[in-house]
Amino acid sequence: MGKGNEDPDLHCSSIQCSTDQPPFQQISFTEKGSDEKKPFKGKGKTAFSHSSEKHTQRQAGSDPNPNKENSEETKLKAGNSTAGSEPESSSYQENCRKRKISSKDICQDRAGNCPEEECNLTLNKKSRSSTAVHNSEIQETCDAHHRGSSRACTGRSKRHRSRALEVQTPSLRKSLVTSVRAMSEAVYQDLAQVWAQQIHSPLTCEQLTLLTRLRGPLCAQVQTLYSMATQAAYVFPAESWLVPATLPGPGDSALDREAHPFPGQEITEPVSGSDEAKLGAP
């Protein structure tokens, strides 16, 4: 009966040990004495606790916490990545800057500006071109209006000038022609008076020669002046009294000169006493 009572306790203790201890440290001994069994239980517990502590220490010493290791590794990796990414980022930024600068230089060398600047320039050029076209159209319209007005003004001024010339030039020409004709008429009258005086008081041969020498150039000058006046007048016809008769040459005698008087001069011959007696006789 004693054995029968001891068996369930042993089984319970073995079950408890199996639940408390890991599977590889399950140790069960079946002894007959209850007194011997109790100290064994305490020893087993202490041994189990010591073994579990040693096992945990070994695990702590040999196998550290994987989460901590992973966190430390991630921190180290992050530090390395940040430490490596900082120079990489700085070098990348420098490369980007160099590329931008080189692209700007290339764009400036080729086209003078970069695409962004080209877009801005194209927009500015378009706006400027539109404003320039608008201004040019306005200027063209203003110029056309100004030209039309200037043409109208010039046409009016030309018409006014032509009318003024038509009004003024005849008076000037008329005064010029009349003055020249009056001068030529006066010269001819002087010549006629000289020849009339020669009849009443005959001149010497020297005076006659000088008179004939003066007569030729004077008549020529008068004729040229009159012809010029006629050409200037365009309208006034030549007067009949200005057309001179054939002038005698320098070798002609006084009788021939008397036979060819100037136009408008009357022939007056001196009458002798015998002729008067003949005329007075019945």
Curated annotation (Swiss-Prot):
GO terms for cellular component: nucleus. The keyword Nucleus applies. Residues 13-31, 58-68, 79-94 have a biased composition (Polar residues). It is found in: Nucleus. Residues 1-96, 249-282 are annotated as: Disordered. Keywords: Nucleus. It comes from the Eukaryota. InterPro entries: FRG2 (IPR026245). Transmembrane segments: none annotated. Residues 1-10 have a biased composition (Basic and acidic residues). Belongs to the FRG2 family. This is Protein FRG2-like-2. It comes from Homo sapiens. The lineage of its organism: Eukaryota, Metazoa, Chordata, Craniata, Vertebrata.
